């Protein structure tokens, strides 16, 4: 409730805002979508998609925001790329059905827990998604074309 009140207080402030951490789309209700639509954004409304259950919520959020005039092209989705590349590919394929949405992939890294991205995770995030190849090719098609997988 506190965060929502803070956002509401910014509506007529004249400030352009940027919530640079990915918001949780599962928390976006009709009321929150309406509040988000009234704010002035620097560029994107940023959401995260770290796991498969978040996909449906992102689709619903895009629909709710659309109801209040916010196009999917104003949405950026942070996509966590774990060692399960099939799951990352699935999430990308599901998200790209929201026409106009932007995706920023980040390979999982947590050195204190011994997690560092492997070569394929880095390729997925830095070359496949960042270059926009995901819009026309599946990860499997891209990786086979590059000789990364059989």
Which residue ranges define each predicted feature?
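Core AdoMet radical
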Residues: 1-61, 74-81, 102-106
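Short, conserved SAM-binding segment of the class I
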Residues: 64
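Auxiliary Fe-S-binding modules of radical SAM enzymes
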Residues: 67-70, 78-150
